């Protein structure tokens, strides 16, 4: 049982996590558009379980299969695990702020930053690998933070397990692993290279990820071919400057002071430099590819929200600085409400189309679009329309085929 003091300090992270879950639940119950295109694919993958697929590891298919078996295949049902993952990310963000010594305001600011970020709202509202990838990155960052704060090398076991599960969710986790390795080599944490716990943790990660690795080897590394083809023919070209601009937009512009403060504090504080590497190294890799979507780096921000929120809260505690807390929290909360339709389908299609037109006219384009194409709605919303009509058309054509052709139709 948690002690009463422990229960009190968990109230805010739990409250914000609950709010996040309710936002997703309500939007899918009352304001949803339709199934997102990739959701059909993941459901089909769930019907054909394997140790890997061309474009993702196996865990999302398992999640789809279990969810469909237990809850059915309604939009609300299949998106429930994603909503839980999004809520878990918010909870861990507040928990990290608490671990850093942050009081109520610091925890609230860290959580609010995660709640209002459109990239997390979008991810938590669709069945895909994205919200689970974001959750595993955040959980791994939490364990790294605990390692840094306690100097207990046994946390490498939890880090290794989380990396392994993350690699079975989305190969994006490999970039976080690169950040951990760089942080070990470039900071005083290289002393852990002599710890058996580090190597046991690394072995745990490899063992968990091994089924998918073997599948890739046996099938000739199809995911690498998929990534190459996507970079050259599917994903839009993104310059380093545009990539950073997309980060600011997808995380909500007013969270910039929070996570940027967190990044500065990480590298100015020797103890936290390993945490800074969890962000900086993946960022440099994604910028170098010039084809990475904003959501690729999004999982690296919760720990920066936590560090930055604690630093801002401490600045607000100084004499004549009480205004800092209001200046940081109130505008973020208000604009978070105003920008919520960007992340959740709470407007009618016509109103969302009008909002998209206004944003495009102001020079704010959908950063998730492929090959720079623009549309009347953001791509993650536009691809939730037209499926009933397509189904009806396919059924009509199929019914018109001779019986012999129907038997051969796929």
Question: PLM features: what roles do these ranges have?
Answer:
Residues 119, 125-133:
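Short acidic/glycine- and proline-prone juxtamembrane loop motifs at membrane-interface regions
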Residues 80-101, 139, 143:
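Transmembrane-helix motifs of polytopic, lipid-linked glycan transferases
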Residues 31, 174-271, 287-290, 341-345:
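Transmembrane-lumen/periplasm boundary regions of multi-pass, lipid-linked membrane glycan transferases
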Residues 2, 13-14, 93-116, 134-135, ...:
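Transmembrane-helix signature of polytopic, membrane-embedded enzymes
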Residues 92, 132-150, 155-163, 307:
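Specific aromatic-rich, kink-prone transmembrane helix
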Residues 98-101, 140-156, 261-270:
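Membrane-interface transmembrane helices that cradle and orient dolichyl/undecaprenyl
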Residues 315-358:
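Signature aromatic-anchored transmembrane alpha helix within multi-pass, membrane-resident enzymes
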Residues 17-20, 110-115, 163, 167, ...:
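Short helix- or helix-capping micro-motifs
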């Amino acid at each position: 049982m948690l002690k009463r003091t422990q229960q009190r300090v968990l109230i805010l992270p739990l409250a914000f996590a609950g709010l996040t879950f309710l936002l997703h639940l309500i939007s899918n119950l009352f304001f949803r558009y339709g199934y997102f295109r990739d959701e059909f694919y993941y459901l089909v993958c769930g019907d054909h379980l394997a140790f890997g697929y061309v474009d993702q590891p196996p865990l999302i298919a398992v999640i789809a299969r279990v969810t469909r078996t237990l809850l059915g295949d309604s939009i609300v049902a299949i998106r429930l695990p994603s909503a839980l993952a999004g809520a878990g990310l918010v909870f861990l963000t507040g928990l990290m702020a608490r671990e850093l010594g942050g009081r109520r305001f610091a925890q609230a600011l860290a959580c609010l930053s995660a709640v209002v970020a459109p990239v997390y709202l979008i991810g938590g509202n669709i069945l895909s690998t994205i919200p689970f990838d974001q959750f595993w990155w955040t959980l791994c960052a939490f364990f790294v933070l605990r390692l840094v704060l306690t100097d207990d090398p046994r946390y490498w076991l939890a880090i290794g397990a989380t990396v392994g599960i993350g690699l079975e969710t989305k190969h994006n986790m490999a970039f976080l692993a690169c950040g951990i390795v760089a942080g070990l080599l470039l900071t005083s944490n290289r002393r852990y290279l002599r710890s058996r716990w580090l190597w046991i943790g690394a072995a745990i990660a490899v063992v968990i990820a091994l089924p998918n690795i073997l599948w890739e080897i046996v099938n000739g590394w199809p995911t690498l071919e998929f990534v190459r083809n996507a970079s050259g023919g599917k994903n839009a070209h993104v310059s380093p400057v545009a990539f950073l601009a997309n980060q600011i937009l997808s995380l909500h512009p007013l969270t910039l002071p929070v996570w940027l403060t967190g990044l500065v504090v990480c590298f100015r504080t020797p103890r936290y430099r390993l945490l800074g590497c969890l962000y900086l190294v993946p960022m440099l890799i994604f910028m170098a590819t010039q084809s990475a979507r904003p959501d690729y780096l999004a999982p690296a921000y919760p720990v920066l929200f936590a560090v930055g929120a604690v630093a801002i809260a401490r600045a607000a505690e100084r004499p004549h600085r009480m205004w800092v807390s209001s200046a940081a929290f109130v505008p973020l909360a208000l604009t978070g409400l105003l920008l919520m339709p960007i992340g959740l389908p709470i407007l009618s299609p016509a109103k969302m189309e009008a909002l998209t037109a206004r944003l495009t006219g102001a020079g704010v384009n959908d950063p998730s679009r492929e090959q720079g194409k623009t549309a009347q709605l953001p791509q993650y919303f536009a691809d939730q329309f037209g499926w009933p009509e397509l189904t009806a058309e396919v059924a009509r054509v199929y019914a018109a085929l001779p019986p012999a052709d129907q038997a051969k139709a796929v």
